[in-house]
């Protein structure tokens, strides 16, 4: 009997250690993704100084919020005087709900890998210097409520994949260089037209007919 109890205790201890190691590996994976972002950014005000890759758990870093399972759920770096570009590794933060990088001077494109963030609720990249298209992959973000990309230099059409996100409540793509027509179906039926203003090549709403450059919108 004592031998059986000992084996059970040994099994329980081994299971606990295994689960702890799994959480450790997951935390390190998320830390690697965040550190890739740090390396891709210029940070003159040292707001990312606590993002130390030698620390096991990124939940101890400033501007990072985690849930009770020590999984990263928020990155809050709005108005932080950051420049550089967005790292595609951000797409590995599978529990991320809020990505707040507004009012910086971030350049380059929006990584298509952000479409892997299946739990994302808010994507705030407004008031930066982003270029390129709005990735079609963002249409996979079925939990997304807030999408604010205004005041950048984005080009191309508004992806129709975004109209299939039932949770989407706020879309703002004003003050870019988007082209084509403004969607009106799905959640876009309730988005005010002012959220599309200051895109000289954007026509809409699309129910008024296709713009002459709809088939050649880049």
Swiss-Prot record:
Keywords: Leucine-rich repeat, Plant defense, Repeat, Signal
UniProt superkingdom: Eukaryota
Keyword Phosphoprotein in record: no
Induction: Up-regulated by methyl jasmonate.
A single GO BP: defense response
Ranges occupied by LRR repeats: 94-117, 119-140, 141-165, 167-190
Signal peptide: 1-27
PANTHER family attached to this UniProt entry: SOMATIC EMBRYOGENESIS RECEPTOR KINASE 1
Subunit structure: Interacts with HIR1.
Function comment: Involved in plant defense response.
Protein name: Leucine-rich repeat protein 1
Annotated gene: LRR1
């Amino acid at each position: 009997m004592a031998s059986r109890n000992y084996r059970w205790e040994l099994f329980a201890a081994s299971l606990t250690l295994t689960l702890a190691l799994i959480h450790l590996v997951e935390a390190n994976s998320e830390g690697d993704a965040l550190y890739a972002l740090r390396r891709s950014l210029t940070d003159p005000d040292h707001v990312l100084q606590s993002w130390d890759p030698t620390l096991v758990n990124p939940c101890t870093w400033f501007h990072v919020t985690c849930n009770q399972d020590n999984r990263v759920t928020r990155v809050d770096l709005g108005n932080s005087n950051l420049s550089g570009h967005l790292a595609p590794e951000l797409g590995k933060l599978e529990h991320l709900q809020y990505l707040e990088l507004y009012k910086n001077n971030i350049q380059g494109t929006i990584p298509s890998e952000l479409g892997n963030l299946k739990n994302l609720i808010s994507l705030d990249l407004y008031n930066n210097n982003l270029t390129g298209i709005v990735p079609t992959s963002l249409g996979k973000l079925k939990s997304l409520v807030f999408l604010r990309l205004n005041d950048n230099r984005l080009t191309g059409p508004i992806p129709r994949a975004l109209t299939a996100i039932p949770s989407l409540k706020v879309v703002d793509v004003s003050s870019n260089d988007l082209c084509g027509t403004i969607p009106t179906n799905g959640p876009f039926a309730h988005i005010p037209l002012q959220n599309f203003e200051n895109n000289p090549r954007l026509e809409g709403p699309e129910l008024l007919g296709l713009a002459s450059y709809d088939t050649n919108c880049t």
